Design a protein with these regions (language model features):
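Loop/turn elements at helix/coil->beta-strand transitions in domains of secreted/extracellular proteins
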Residues: 44-47, 78-81, 114-115
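N-terminal "domain-start" segment that seeds a small globular fold
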Residues: 20-39
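Typically the conserved alpha-helix immediately C-terminal to a functionally engaged Cys/Sec
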Residues: 60-75
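Solvent-exposed loop/turn segments at secondary-structure junctions
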Residues: 54-58, 66, 87-92, 125-127
Length: 128
């Protein structure tokens, strides 16, 4: 039960609209999760992966109303490492174990079937 506290807290925090971030600001895209894991280990911050699709209106709403404002605050006082994964793209990605894949394949491997999907991870890629 205690393993659910962080995700539930974050979901509750995300349910309260924070306003809009500056238009056009892009969220950080996942490139090398190994590097992100090293940073998470040093800073002791969780990694939040945002799986989304450009054709998903709920994804856009979550991004604009919640994730962009959270990321803007997060840049001033870091609380997590946010990375995005667009589930229909074949953009290259290095996974936590150093293997090379692409966004679409990685999302499938992670069992992501619906978007938006938030995944809260520790520095070794383990679910929190």
């Amino acid at each position: 039960m205690s393993g659910l506290r962080l995700p539930i807290f974050v979901l509750v925090a995300l349910s309260v609209p924070l306003g809009c971030a500056v238009a056009g600001e892009a969220l950080p895209v996942a490139v090398d999760l190994r590097v992100d894991a090293q940073r998470a280990r040093v800073t002791r911050l969780p990694i939040v992966l945002f799986f989304h699709s450009t054709t998903c209106p709920f994804c856009r709403e979550l991004e604009e109303l919640h994730l962009k404002p959270l990321q803007a605050d997060n840049e001033k006082a870091p609380r997590f490492l946010l990375r995005t994964v667009e589930v229909s793209q074949t953009r290259p990605l290095v996974t936590f174990d150093g293997s090379k894949t692409d966004f679409r394949t990685y999302a499938r491997q992670q069992g992501v079937t619906l978007v938006p999907h938030l995944r809260f991870l520790g520095p070794d890629g383990e679910a929190l």
